[in-house]
Amino acid sequence: MASSMSLKLACVVVLCMVVGAPLAQGAVTSGQVTNSLAPCINYLRGSGAGAVPPGCCTGIKSLNSAAQTTPVRQAACRCIKSAAAGITGINFGLASGLPGKCGVNIPYKISPSTDCNSVK
């Protein structure tokens, strides 16, 4: 159960990051978003000490590359927010810094308050 919640939270965080980045041709499923962000969960539940896990950055970069259209980015955002709502202990301060730490630049704040409809 905790693993499922962690995966959902990671999905939410990554999805928010993906909101600024594009998702590949066609639609991206919530399962794909969640799987891409799952490696980020333990980092986001911790103190932020140490490096971001390589798998986390790989997932963030992959989602960023995949989100090529506004509808796909908005859908990814919704998926991430939904998943994050089911995960406890996420440090959203760390989440907002993940894109930069992974070398990805997105023009949106990663936050539970992000309005997915405003994602372009």
Swiss-Prot record:
The keyword Disulfide bond applies. Residues 1-26 form the signal peptide. SMART domains: AAI (SM00499). CDD domains: nsLTP1 (cd01960). One of its GO terms (molecular function) is lipid binding. Gene3D superfamilies: Plant lipid-transfer and hydrophobic proteins. InterPro entries: Bifun_inhib/LTP/seed_sf, Bifunc_inhib/LTP/seed_store, Plant_nsLTP. Keywords: Disulfide bond, Lipid-binding, Signal, Transport. One of its GO terms (biological process) is lipid transport. Disulfide bonds join 40-56, 57-102, 77-116. Pfam families: Tryp_alpha_amyl. Belongs to the plant LTP family. Plant non-specific lipid-transfer proteins transfer phospholipids as well as galactolipids across membranes. May play a role in wax or cutin deposition in the cell walls of expanding epidermal cells and certain secretory tissues. This is Non-specific lipid-transfer protein.
